[in-house]
Amino acid sequence: ETEQSDITVAQAYLQIVLARCIGKLNLVEKSNVGSNDLIYQTVSYISANFKKKFSLEEMAKDLGVSKYVLSRLFSQIFHRNFNQYLNDARLNYACYRLENTRDSITNICLDSGFESQRTFNRTFKERYKISPSDYRSRTLS
């Protein structure tokens, strides 16, 4: 009998604790969870694939969303379009390689996902206002 009453008291205390905890929880609407999940998937996808050639359409297909949803995500969350975000990932990697290796600029350019050195040089100069070779010289000195 005392064992049963101990269980009843324990259950009552547990219900009080749970009731207090529920009030502290931050509940999130399902639509926001999905959106955050897509943001995570987008960042992960680009991090894993920026060295390859791929389009917004291919990425959207792989993630199971329309290219319009993905395009809007880039605009609203990242405040840049798909190509700008992808080039940022590629440029960040290229800068790391320029600063930390003696690899040729051509190899760095191609390994970073750029299709040509001309595109790489133009994109790099637009972003950093300096050529990749000058950037390397300044960071290594």
Describe the residue ranges of each PLM region.
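A ubiquitous short alpha-helical element
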Residues: K30, E57-E58
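Sigma70-family region 2
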Residues: G23-V28, K51, S75-Q76
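Terminal helix-turn-helix DNA-binding modules in bacterial transcription factors
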Residues: Y40-S44, A48, K53-E57, V65, ...
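Helix-turn-helix
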Residues: M59-K67, S71
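An amphipathic alpha-helical interaction segment
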Residues: E1-D37, Q41-S44, V69
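Short acidic/histidine-centered micro-motifs embedded in hydrophobic/aromatic stretches
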Residues: Y13, D62, D111
